[in-house]
Amino acid sequence: MQSWYLLYCKRGQLQRAQEHLERQAVNCLAPMITLEKIVRGKRTAVSEPLFPNYLFVEFDPEVIHTTTINATRGVSHFVRFGASPAIVPSAVIHQLSVYKPKDIVDPSTPYPGDKVIITEGAFEGFQAIFTEPDGEARSMLLLNLINKEIKHSVKNTEFRKL
């Protein structure tokens, strides 16, 4: 009888494991999430696995043995409870396939109103308040200089969130 199981894949080989398992007629699910991150100084949307290195697989152990799955390229091992691989309920798989999170931002990416510290440039060491993105590679910060608030555009690589 077909059931869902959870595999742990070797680091960086989730895609490889999924491709090889699908060639063996194993149904695979690797839920993805889109994050807004600052990569090389630019705000970009990046798609990442919701559960890094974990892959949900559906197969019948009477047809395809677990050792065949375990020996597949990119697969490290089954997640187990005791001696046998853990069976994941179909309701959990259904929820994961239906769930589509929106507007998720990397925790290190500042939101408007967050305090930041400037790490480079003329204002190095100053604390500021992040107000808004200014294009892909820059952001607007609110600086308090001599009791006067000044808006200043700074490269995304020149500050970090506190």
From Swiss-Prot:
**CDD domains, from UniProt?**
NGN_SP_RfaH
User: What InterPro entries would the database entry show?
Assistant: NGN-like_dom (IPR006645), NGN_dom_sf (IPR036735), NusG-like (IPR043425), Transcription_antiterm_RfaH (IPR010215)
What would you give as a GO molecular function for this chain, any one? transcription antitermination factor activity, DNA binding
Q: Does the keyword Transmembrane helix apply?
A: no
Instruction: Say yes or no: keyword Transcription regulation present.
Output: yes
Gene Ontology terms: biological process: transcription elongation-coupled chromatin remodeling
Give the UniProt keywords, A-Z: DNA-binding, Transcription, Transcription antitermination, Transcription regulation
A single GO cellular-component term on record: cytosol
Phenotypic effect of disruption: Inactivation results in increased initial adhesion and biofilm formation.
- Assigned protein family: Belongs to the RfaH family.
Family annotation (NCBIfam families): PRK09014.1, RfaH
**Which PANTHER family would you find in this protein's record?**
RHO-INTERACTING TRANSCRIPTION TERMINATION FACTOR NUSG, TRANSCRIPTION ANTITERMINATION PROTEIN RFAH
HAMAP family named in the record: RfaH
Q: What does this protein do?
A: Enhances distal genes transcription elongation in a specialized subset of operons that encode extracytoplasmic components. RfaH is recruited into a multi-component RNA polymerase complex by the ops element, which is a short conserved DNA sequence located downstream of the main promoter of these operons. Once bound, RfaH suppresses pausing and inhibits Rho-dependent and intrinsic termination at a subset of sites. Termination signals are bypassed, which allows complete synthesis of long RNA chains.
Q: What is this protein called?
A: Transcription antitermination protein RfaH
